[in-house]
A protein has these predicted regions:
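Bacterial N-terminal signal peptides
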Residues: 6-15
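Positively charged n-region of N-terminal signal peptides that target proteins for export
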Residues: 1-4
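Rhodanese-like catalytic fold shared by cysteine-dependent sulfurtransferases
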Residues: 19-43, 57-112, 122-185
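Short hydrophobic beta-strand that contains or immediately precedes a catalytic carboxylate
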Residues: 46-51, 69
Length: 185
């Protein structure tokens, strides 16, 4: 019964066009639906972790992704004093790297592409939107990303414990897969 329900849910998720999805997540997909899609049709999908590899090193990784292609890379020479952090800049090779990853898998720009960042909002959604604007019509992003949203109040305020891939019981590890992680030239 669980398999039938999962198959029906996955089938429904694949048939609903993005235009009919929830306005807040017009082309978002849940972590669970992403996992199920990768299990059922992973050879037809390119699942990309768009975080900077250094972030992955400290936060965790799921080997369910096909590849790490950062959308933004932290520039360790550009300090943002106002926000007390290094400034991230768009990866100038992002589109070319996605094209190469698709080609390596025998896919084209019409394939489903799913991006995932830490929370879904800062890089996941923008990277999927950027891909759509650059000819990848079926790009989506994992809503709430890898770690999810922060808890706003109480003892665990500030912790990312309420949603996202990591908090959904899906496979992840503290170790990275070196075969999938982006390396700078």
């Amino acid at each position: 019964m669980k398999r039938l329900l999962a198959a029906c849910t996955l089938g429904l998720a694949l048939t609903i066009p993005a235009a009919h999805a929830d306005d807040a997540h017009e082309f978002g997909i849940s972590p669970q639906a992403t996992y199920e899609l990768m299990q059922e049709r992973g050879d037809e999908v390119l699942f990309i972790d768009v975080r900077d590899p250094v972030e992955i090193m400290f936060v965790g990784f799921t080997d369910e992704v096909d590849l790490n292609i950062p959308f933004l890379l932290v520039d360790r020479h550009d300090w943002d004093a106002e926000n007390n952090r290094f400034r991230p800049g768009r990866n100038p090779e992002f589109v070319a790297q996605v094209d190469a990853a698709l080609e390596a898998r025998g896919l084209d720009r019409d394939a489903r592409i799913i991006t995932m960042c830490r929370s879904g909002s800062e890089r996941g959604e923008p990277s999927a939107r950027f891909l759509r604007e650059n000819g990848f019509a079926n790009a989506r992003y994992v809503v709430n990303g890898f770690q999810g949203d922060t808890i706003r109040e109480g003892e665990y305020a500030g912790f990312r414990l309420k949603n996202g891939w990591q908090n959904s019981g899906l496979p992840w590890d503290t170790r990275m897969n070196p075969e999938k992680i982006h390396r700078s030239d």
